[in-house]
Amino acid sequence: ERLGGRLRVAASGAAPLGKDLASFFEAVGMPLIEGYGLTEGGVVTLNPLDRPKSGSIGKPLPGVELKRAEDGELLVKSPALFLGYYKDPEATGAVLRDGWLYTGDIAEIDDEGYVYITGRKKELIVSSNGKKIYPARIESLFKIEPVINQVLLIGDRLPYVTALFTLNAGHSGDTKEMARSPQVFEQIKNAVSRVNSQLPPFEQIRKFRILDRDFTIEDGEMTPTMKVRRNRVLENFRTEVSEMYAGKEESQ
């Protein structure tokens, strides 16, 4: 009613939608379907209204061709592809090859043609024992938790996965006080247990730290389009990260 009373469906894009969040909106009578697009290629996929699949970004739109590279990267060909980056042939050549746009996203395509984004190629974590982990998919599982604002998975060339969390302080705005709260710690510990129960052992979060501030543009941890700069976060919070890889492996 607050949205006018005639809203029947909403679309989501730009970042993975957690399954729990999608289920919540469906339960309250507002299906939230996912699609996928990018500046260089326009809208690429959308879930069909009559048969959406949770966790999928849908099927390619008319005129759009998709395929996967050998490493799983999603490639797109369509009339909507851009001609190239302005006065930057080197950058253009890196993403446009033989009429295909290399998206940088790792994807799976099922037998019915539904596409699932599993991570970003450049954000791939490879553990010290060679296991490949796509952090974006796991991070998206925390979206339903109201106390969590941001989450960053760590584990590249390391023996196990850890995480940094920032907090959603709501109206109080006091994340420093929240970060010291035993109740908040238990909430996040329970959230980690919930997510871990959905993951194979090599992807499970073994330790975590709760930060008393957000990742910010001013500190170089976020881009102007609000994407996390993982390397800068690791540099700025290297003490917290080092602590998680010292001593025993159980969660803290």
What is the predicted role of each segment?
Residues 150-153, 193-252:
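Conserved C-terminal "lid"/linker of ANL adenylate-forming enzymes
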Residues 115-143, 171-182, 201-205, 219, ...:
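Adenylate-forming
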Residues 60-127, 144:
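Conserved ATP-binding/catalytic segment of the ANL
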Residues 106, 111, 144-170:
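C-terminal boundary motif of the adenylate-forming
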Residues 81, 121, 138, 157-159:
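A generic "binding-loop/recognition-motif" signal
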Residues 156-175, 198-212:
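Conserved loop-to-beta-strand segment in the C-terminal subdomain of adenylate-forming
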Residues 1-71, 79, 158-160, 167-178:
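Conserved adenylate-forming
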Residues 37-41, 103, 127-128, 223-225:
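Ser/Thr-glycine-rich phosphate-binding loops at phosphate-binding pockets of nucleotides
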